[in-house]
Amino acid sequence: GRGGFVRRVAMIKEERKRNPDLLYFDSGDFSQGSAYYTMFKGDVEIGLMNLMGLDAVTIGNHEFDFGLENMARLFRMANFPIVCANYDFTGTVCEDVVKPYVVLHRNGLKIGVFGLSPKMKGLVADKNCEGVKYLDPIATARKTAEVLKKKEKCDVVICVSHMGWADGKEYDANVIQGSRYIDLVLGGHTHTYMKHLEYVKDLDGHDVPVDQNGKHAIYVGRIVMNLK
């Protein structure tokens, strides 16, 4: 990005000083974009992300670029959770390193965070995702958000998504329209820069905010949630 990782790390540290309850997420495709990734296959990116103190990330299609073995290796290096509810990694090397969701705690509140990722066909070489099952993101979001709200008793439910923002099936808007209990969607994949939050109504008619911050780590989004 324009500011570079060093400035980003410094900025996040300053933000955490001002607000110790800050949550920081990444919506995927963090493994690609520079010659460093081509040379070191993600070690540099994961090392720098570890310095930023991420609370959770989801999986983008470019995380598969060097195959499942490399993806699992990188995820084990990460000191933050990898969440994706609609990829079934059962029987693969990633089975034990990817969770459908995590529950975070801040200032007495429980925040449930789950991830959604796009259909691999057409985006990922078959040999790089062999054995991974793609689950319907809308049905998965509906089920996972309900688990977080009802079973885990979360005060807030956040979806960190790499589905994308555009007209068409299985994008963020469709996920929201087919689910309930999601309070915020943090998007990626389509490189959309939103100057302001977009809102989509869920199954119960509630307006759910969506944010996406462009591409290449040029921008960092900042959202303040007021819980009533």
Where do the PLM segments sit?
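Acidic, metal/ion-coordinating pockets
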Residues: 1-228
